[in-house]
Amino acid sequence: MTLPVKFPLLLAQGAMGIAVGLKCEILPHNFNELIDASIAYLRDEPFVLYPDFRTGGMIDVRGYNDGERGCKVQVRARITQLDKKTLVITEIPYGTTTGSLNESITMAGEKGQIKIRRVDDNTSRNAEIVIHLASGVSPDQTIDALYAFTQCQVSLNSLCTCVIRNEHPEFTTISAILKESTDRTLDLLSWELKIKLDELERDWHLISLEKIFFEKRIYKILEKDADSWDDQVAEIERAFDPYRQMLKTEITRDDVLRLCEKPVRKISKFDIKKAEEQILDIESQLEKVKYDLDHIVD
């Protein structure tokens, strides 16, 4: 059993897999940008997708190349200068944590690669790493050093967009996955609408049949004596002959049996006006579903 997804979840969340001689890494992408790209594809318009990370930061996508095998990106932390002696990191690179970033900054300080007095990790809901600089140190030079010697800059190299198709790995691109996912979503939506259409048409048929059964007093046949139950059912079927053109589908024996098995209480309380209202409501729903099917890409 499979549970179909109507959204390119693989591209939104990203994924990583390792096999013998092969590593696959698909970076996460922005939800809204994926939606916009899907719409552009359906409208036969060009689109470009780049990774986007929940941890924030800045990204150099010049080597991304639509996620083709061997592509690469560089990710940087967002560092701001609070004053001449203080720097603050508010967004961290993808694949790092505030703990690992803090540790890399401390180690760079111990090696003399950057000159700092201390590092405070004030992270709660959002990242906030405060770096206190040593006296006389340039904030701009320290920022450059942080990118050069710590996890404030991370290179993601040899990325590979690979999916399993027919039990075999297949190298592909981000845009190809998005197009396939969008087509699949279109198929799922069409499938759901067709199921809904069938259900509504079936409901319309049954209620219309029931209305004729009571309004034309066909149920009275059940009060007559008959040689057998089959003869009585056959007579009821024939009684519907003048009204078959009012229906959209053929009347089956199961339809007739369903009507014959209704209890007397149901017959006595049947409300023709309510049935007419139900039929009108179903017809309104049918129009909407048919419109949605005809304009599914609009």
Q: Where on the chain are the PLM-derived regions?
A:
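C-terminal interaction appendages of subunits in large macromolecular complexes
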Residues: 2-3, 9, 13-298
